[in-house]
A protein has these predicted regions:
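Acidic/polar-rich alpha-helix caps and helix-coil junctions
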Residues: 3-73, 81-84, 94-260
Length: 260
C-alpha cells in the first residue's frame, strides 16, 4: 500500500502505511537480515521459527522450474547473460569496499558481473528457492522516502540508517539532513535486480540515463544503446494493450505510441 501511495504522491499516507507494515511484520517475527546473514540469505527459504525479512514471495519448487527461462538462467554466464550489472552501478556500490552487498555480486573476467539473488545455492543446478517480491528492507526504504518527502528528517534518518548500517555497521546517517537523492541511491544499492530502479526514477520526474563507463573489474556490460536516456514521456513506459483485448472491445484506444 505504501508503494501505491508513493506513486500517487500521497506521502503522508505512504509513511503511515510503511510504518504499519514494519510494525506488523516485526510483531510477527520478521526482521531485517543482519550484516552476517545477508550474503547467504538469498536462495534459502525462511522457516516458521525464523521468517527473515521476505514478506511476500512466489513459491517455487524444483518441479516448477522453467529451465532455460528461469531467473537464474537469465542471470548467469552459462545462460543468457541478460541480468548483468553495469559498471556505473558497480562503481556506486564499491565506493564503500566494506558494503556487504558487494558479496552478492559475482564476476567472470571473460564476460559480465552478476547479482546472485536468484541463482542456485549450495551447489544446486536448479534453484528451488522461493522468489522474493517484497522485503522488509523495501518497507524501511519506503518509510524513509516518504519521510523525506513530508519533511520528517528524524524518521527519514531512523529508517534509512537501519539499511545503511546493515550494509556496513561502521556507516551512519545520524545527524544528517537527508535528501531524496540519498534515499534513491540507497534504494538503488539495496533493491538492485528486484525491479524498482526505473520506476523510482520515472515516478520522481527524473531521467533514466544509461552511463557508459569502464571498470577494470568488469570485462563487459550491456546497454540498450537505442535508448540511452528517457523520461516519463517515453511511450514505452506503458506497454501496448494486447491485440486480443483490442479486438474484444472496438471502443478500446491503444496506448500512445503504438499502432491501433
Amino acid at each position: 500500500a505504501s508503494d501505491v501511495y508513493k506513486r500517487q504522491g500521497e506521502y503522508n499516507e505512504a509513511l503511515t502505511m510503511a510504518e504499519n507494515a514494519i510494525k506488523g511484520a516485526e510483531k510477527e517475527g520478521y526482521a531485517l537480515w543482519t550484516n552476517e546473514e545477508y550474503p547467504t540469505a538469498w536462495g534459502n527459504d525462511a522457516s516458521a521459527s525464523n521468517p527473515g525479512e521476505i514478506l511476500f514471495e512466489i513459491v517455487n519448487l524444483t518441479t516448477d522450474s522453467p529451465g532455460k527461462e528461469s531467473m537464474g538462467y537469465l542471470n548467469s554466464y552459462n545462460g543468457y547473460d541478460d541480468m548483468c550489472i553495469t559498471c556505473s552501478f558497480y562503481q556506486l556500490l564499491k565506493k564503500d569496499p566494506k558494503d556487504v552487498r558487494l558479496k552478492i555480486l559475482s564476476f567472470d573476467k571473460k564476460y559480465y558481473a552478476y547479482v546472485n539473488k536468484y541463482q542456485p545455492q549450495q551447489g544446486e543446478n536448479i534453484t528451488d528457492a522461493n522468489i522474493p517480491l517484497i522485503r522488509l528492507s523495501e518497507a524501511y526504504l519506503n518509510a524513509a522516502e516518504a519521510a523525506v518527502q513530508t519533511g520528517d528528517n528524524a524518521k527519514a534518518v531512523k529508517y534509512l540508517n537501519s539499511i545503511v548500517q546493515r550494509a556496513n555497521p561502521e556507516n551512519s546517517v545520524e545527524g544528517k539532513t537527508l535528501t531524496l537523492e540519498n534515499v534513491l541511491d540507497e534504494r538503488r544499492k539495496e533493491l538492485v535486480a528486484e525491479g524498482h530502479r526505473m520506476y523510482d526514477v520515472i515516478r520522481n520526474g527524473m531521467t533514466v540515463k544509461r552511463i557508459d563507463v569502464k571498470d577494470s573489474d568488469i570485462n563487459k556490460t550491456k546497454h540498450n544503446t537505442a535508448y540511452m536516456e528517457y523520461d516519463w514521456n517515453f511511450h514505452k513506459i506503458l506497454l501496448p494493450i494486447p491485440q486480443k483485448e483490442m479486438d474484444a472491445n472496438p471502443n478500446m484506444k491503444q496506448n500512445p505510441g503504438y499502432v491501433d
